[in-house]
């Protein structure tokens, strides 16, 4: 038990502590930036200064600091996060490390993401579940390519709150002029980001603890909040609840003949008992009869809650269907444009079929065309015949069936999908819907999916056979 928990238990008692803890809001955030900007040290400082470290953890850090630490005689707080042996020996972050802590105001889940360019896919994975990005900048180096890269990816993945932490201010003598230079440079770059992004910029020293949990005595010229105060105050719940109601069905719950409900987690918006709803893609409508949870029925539920909905009418709804409010504007299409982050050595090439999973729905998709690849160091675009490992580009997709979806910026759960290799079952990429295109009408055919894949395989490996492209025949 850490000292913060002990203090709260002494003040509130066990029942009071558990009740308070249960009703705290949750913020998921990631730390990112260039290599050796101090991301892991910052998280270690947050945990240490908010008294979230157990005594045995602190003892282990003191011991390991003498062997692989980089802070001399002081404990290397980065070791609280860098758990892999390779990370500790190299002094870098490779995998996405998740840490949990809480204060009296809020609960937090931190994703510590790698800074190296070759681990961009790991960083994208960490960002996909977060609400806010803490982007670190070394005060000595300023805004680097990797800073721009991670800002772009965080923005692409729909994060609307950025905290830019100018770290290592102790190494530039806590210079206000240097901080203002970096602030101006980053704000100029941020004008190229999509949508409206809330950006706050603060000077910190993760090593010394300045402006992390406590205000700095060395930077009296900074009058803003500390990093922890920003994290405790940012409101992400209202944004999710303000969106249109989206409920991807994960499971049809039928424990007996008298009960049939549809289980899942509300992606956005609010639903109430008595609301008129429509199930997609069938288009059938009904009314919400009950909102069932483990703790009892609710009159209304909002984004983030896992619930089971029962309806007044018996309509056909299956796993992967989407329940929305009646009359909601939802795209139903098999043709779309999506930004893709590619995560495997074998490049993404047009014409190949992949398994697609989107909001509980599984289908088959194909890249028809790569419109462009992003140079995510300067946000420029260039033409590309394929997407390499860690490449990000805008691709045109067709699916085997029409699917109800949203733009990713509007709702990540119903606008994001994963791409799976059909032979190895490995997740090879992530897609974010940017635009729904005119639906492609496919002619009826006697060709099965297996025959189409076999045809593609033959044309690839035995071109001298001059086999015709069956998929092209279907378009005629």
Swiss-Prot record:
Biological process (GO), any one: hydrogen sulfide biosynthetic process
Class in the EC hierarchy, top level: transferase
Residues binding GTP, per UniProt: 33-40, 112-116, 167-170
Record-annotated tr-type G domain positions: 24-243
Chain positions covered by the region annotation G1: 33-40
G4 as annotated region, ranges: 167-170
The protein's name in its UniProt record: Sulfate adenylyltransferase subunit 1
Recorded name of the encoding gene: cysN
């Amino acid at each position: 038990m850490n000292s913060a928990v002990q203090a709260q238990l002494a003040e509130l008692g066990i029942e009071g502590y558990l009740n308070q803890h249960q009703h705290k809001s949750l913020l998921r955030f990631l730390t990112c930036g260039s290599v050796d900007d101090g991301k892991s040290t910052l998280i270690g400082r947050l945990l240490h200064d908010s008294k979230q470290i157990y005594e045995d953890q602190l003892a282990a850090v003191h011991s390991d600091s003498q062997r692989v630490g980089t802070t001399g005689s002081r404990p290397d707080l980065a070791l609280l996060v860098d758990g892999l042996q390779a990370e500790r020996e190299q002094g870098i972050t490779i995998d996405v490390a998740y840490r949990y802590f809480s204060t009296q105001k809020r609960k937090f889940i931190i994703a510590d993401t790698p800074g190296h360019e070759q681990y961009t896919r790991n960083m994208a994975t960490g960002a996909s579940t977060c609400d806010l990005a803490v982007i670190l900048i070394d005060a000595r180096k300023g805004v680097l390519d990797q800073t721009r890269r991670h800002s772009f990816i965080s923005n692409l993945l729909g994060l609307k709150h950025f905290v830019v932490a100018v770290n290592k201010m102790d190494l530039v003598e806590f210079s206000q002029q240097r901080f203002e230079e970096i602030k101006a440079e980053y704000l100029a770059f941020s004008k190229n980001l999509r949508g409206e992004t809330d950006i706050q910029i603060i000077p910190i020293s993760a090593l010394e603890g300045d402006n992390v949990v406590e205000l700095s005595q060395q930077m009296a010229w900074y009058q803003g909040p500390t990093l922890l105060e920003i994290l405790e105050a940012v409101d992400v719940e209202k944004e999710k609840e303000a969106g249109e109601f989206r409920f991807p069905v994960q499971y049809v719950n039928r424990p007996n003949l008298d009960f049939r409900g549809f289980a899942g987690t509300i992606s956005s918006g609010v639903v109430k008992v008595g609301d008129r709803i429509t199930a997609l893609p069938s288009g059938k409508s009904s009314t919400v009869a009950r909102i069932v949870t483990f703790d009892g029925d609710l009159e209304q539920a909002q984004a983030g809650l896992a619930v089971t909905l029962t309806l007044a009418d018996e309509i056909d709804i299956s796993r992967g269907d989407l329940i929305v409010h009646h009359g909601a504007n939802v795209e139903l299409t098999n043709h779309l444009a999506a930004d893709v982050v590619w995560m495997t050595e074998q490049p993404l090439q047009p014409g190949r079929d992949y398994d697609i999973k989107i909001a509980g729905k599984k289908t088959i998709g194909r890249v028809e065309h790569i419109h462009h690849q992003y140079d995510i160091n300067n946000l420029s675009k260039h033409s590309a015949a394929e997407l390499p490992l860690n490449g990000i580009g805008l691709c045109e997709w067709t699916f085997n069936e029409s699917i109800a979806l949203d733009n990713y910026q509007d709702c990540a759960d119903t606008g994001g999908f994963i791409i799976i290799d059909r032979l190895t079952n490995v997740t090879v990429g992530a897609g974010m819907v940017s635009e729904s295109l005119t639906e492609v009408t496919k002619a009826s055919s006697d060709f099965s999916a297996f025959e189409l894949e076999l045809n593609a395989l033959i044309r690839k490996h035995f071109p001298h056979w001059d086999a015709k492209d069956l998929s092209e025949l279907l378009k005629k």
